[in-house]
Amino acid sequence: MAKPARRKCKICKEWFHPAFSNQWWCCPEHGTQLALERRSKEREKAEKAAEKKRRREEQKQKDKLKIRKLALKPRSYWIKQAQQAVNAFIRERDRDLPCISCGTLTSAQWDAGHYRTTAAAPQLRFDERNIHKQCVVCNQHKSGNLVPYRVELINRIGQEAVDEIESNHNRHRWTVEECRAIKAKYQQKLKDLRNSRSEAA
């Protein structure tokens, strides 16, 4: 029977001739040491797997809790979330345009200002034609500065569209489901718009 080819001891790295095909130690002491090291590695591997499983379960519980908490959020929360997503899109859409009311190109803060307010016409809260980039002064300190807003709005979207906005009195109560869908829609629209602009640059 052919003698097994010599190999290096896993512990001391010295060459030796094994007595068995699965022998990787040159002496009993190194065999014991190798067994202990392997057992330690297996234990460490098992502990890591257990920790990974624990974290996964913990994350599942957190996700479930988050879902439950979101389910308890009032309708006003989701309206605000949807409005923030729409406003972010409007500001990006109009980023190169001046304030729709006063025409300034500089502002400490840019808002997404409604022509017909959300209180007066909640049904138009998320209508892109009714929302445009506006400087903080016109939007917050001049109550929307609506007279010049209307003039520029006609220039941008046309008289017919403005008439349609002004004659829309079909009040609508936005549901949580609608607001969630609007939030997702405008987050995606914002992402797509930014991507298209970066590709064109």
Swiss-Prot record:
Residues 36-64 are annotated as: Disordered. InterPro entries: Phage_lambda_NinG. It comes from the Viruses. Belongs to the ninG family. This is Protein ninG.
